[in-house]
Amino acid sequence: MKISLIIPSYNTKYHLINTYNSIRKYYKDIELVIINDGSTDNTSEWLDNLKDNNVIKINSKERKGHTFFYDEGMRQATNEIVGIMHSDMIIGPNYIENTLKYLERGKVVCATRIEPPIHPAGKEKIVMDFGMDHNDLKLDEFEKFCNEKSNEFKDVTTKGIFAPWILYKEDHFAIRNDTK
């Protein structure tokens, strides 16, 4: 299945670079819709200089907010299945495969996320410290953890809506009561 990932960003350039690199580590050809939401931290220049034929770039000079750009990203994405990520998220191995196996029409599939211990625990996440700042991420430890725990959590599901998520594009517009 072909999938597009939408990643809006507001003043998170260095986190966005980590997000982009984590996706490209596992998925070289997946379509990305990367959105600069009026950032003032040189995200615009980074996006302009990004050489990747599988990236649709939306470079807004005006801040419009994530919700606006979720919709715009959906409109620009060329694939039937679309995921939304925050610009400070990184993915582990098999992220796409593990979320797609639960995807059905009319459903939103949210992935379990790992957050540092400054955030409260919740059933939708694992609290672990792999670094907070874009400079101190322990990516090798994160990948090792994902690989070791993938079997333990492979059939664990929870109810709720939280990022990152994947759904059929038409379902997004149906939820929004939007005809595109």
What residues fall within each predicted segment?
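A recurrent flexible, glycine/aromatic-enriched loop bordering the glycosyltransferase active site
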Residues: 145-169
